[in-house]
Amino acid sequence: MYKRQIERAQQILCLLKEMSEEGSLPKDAKVFLDSPMAKKVTNVYKKWSELLSKHCQKFKNHPFEFPQLKLVKDVEESKKINDIERGCVIIAGSGMCTGGRILHHFKHRIWNPRNTVLFVGYQAKGTLGRKIIEGEKYIRIYHEDIIVKSKIVTINGFSAHADQKELISWMQEFDKLDRIFLIHGEYDKQVIFKSVIKNIMDKKAHIVEMKEKIYI
């Protein structure tokens, strides 16, 4: 499973904790959090657990601790995960699969049709993650071409970005809105959103190009 280290990893751990308590996560399953940064961030979340959402505070024990979870200590321990043949969950980064320990796990597992690669975040154009979800048959890792035979699944519900409806609602809160600039997102999505802004708000939006100068 690919993930981002800050917040996304903790959301996933919270859900797995819930599954563990409900019994839908097998007791003999192993869940590996294999990311130094995610591990450090999780410790920060633990320190300030009273500030977590009500959903995360409902558990009997800490939301980021459950019997199946193993926090991977170092690179050597990460490599030992390759010896596991039974079902397990590996949570690793980096964000869009452009580096980090996820590459190591891809090399050893993405060629196997018994495995599933689960994406829980956006993959930008040109990244390895985007190539995988678009059906690339071979990916290059550590100067080696690896065939992709694993099942590829994407869950979009973890996005931290506001959706189209939320952005429109936010803009409608302003008493005076003279100019709207679209600076984030893929171009085809920006074109659609520009049209939505015109239809709903009767406002013109400008799609900003790379290195374009805007004078206010």
Predicted regions and their residues:
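Acidic/His-rich, metal-assisted hydrolase cores and their charged scaffolds
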Residues: 3-216
